């Protein structure tokens, strides 16, 4: 399902110098579209348009309708090059999406029930996130906007791993499939509790 739309124009003026001129004089961003059974294509996007799109976190894990000079492509954002100081997009890579071919994409994690987690509410612990996104493999129609991490039953000292997550039907966690059951989050003793314990020990 396509929820986002971007407009682009075919780019014939290539090279680093041309890219700098585009950004400086026209407010345009150079980009490349690749994948599928077509040749890579160089395009330009309006900086304002892609900046507005990226304000929505879901754009990074959604299929995008890219209109290239009247022709339509369905794509995913695969890479962004940003200005090191100002943060604006300097270059973008888009991967063509084929409906019946599995794709890989990075999907954000949404942590829920952190305030009522057993290790927080009953033991005064603090939650640490080890990763904020996961790489998934699925058909385009099954690509989730995010994956939830329910912290409600997590106790003090407990670690949540990829194997504890509930991936939607048809979605495979790439690292887990390769035997890497990565840590996602944990609940540890808060610094305040640790410091109080140290002070009490010193007093004794």
UniProtKB/Swiss-Prot annotation:
Keyword Ribonucleoprotein annotated: yes
InterPro entries registered for this protein in UniProt: Rbsml_bL25/Gln-tRNA_synth_N (IPR020056), Ribosomal_bL25/Gln-tRNA_synth (IPR011035), Ribosomal_bL25_b-dom (IPR020057), Ribosomal_bL25_C (IPR037121), Ribosomal_bL25_long (IPR001021), Ribosomal_L25_dom (IPR029751), Ribosomal_uL5_bac-type (IPR020930)
GO CC terms: cytosolic large ribosomal subunit
Gene Ontology MF terms: 5S rRNA binding; structural constituent of ribosome
Pfam family, one: Ribosomal_TL5_C
Gene Ontology biological-process entries: translation
Post-translational modification Phosphoserine, affected residues: 123
Keywords linked to the UniProt accession: Phosphoprotein, Ribonucleoprotein, Ribosomal protein, RNA-binding, rRNA-binding
Protein family per UniProt: Belongs to the bacterial ribosomal protein bL25 family. CTC subfamily.
Free-text function comment from the UniProt entry: This is one of the proteins that binds to the 5S RNA in the ribosome where it forms part of the central protuberance.
PANTHER family linked to this entry: RIBOSOMAL PROTEIN L25/GLN-TRNA SYNTHETASE, ANTI-CODON-BINDING DOMAIN-CONTAINING PROTEIN, RIBOSOMAL PROTEIN L25_GLN-TRNA SYNTHETASE, ANTI-CODON-BINDING DOMAIN-CONTAINING PROTEIN
Assembly: Part of the 50S ribosomal subunit; part of the 5S rRNA/L5/L18/L25 subcomplex. Contacts the 5S rRNA. Binds to the 5S rRNA independently of L5 and L18.
Name listed for the protein in its UniProt record: Large ribosomal subunit protein bL25
Gene giving rise to this polypeptide: rplY
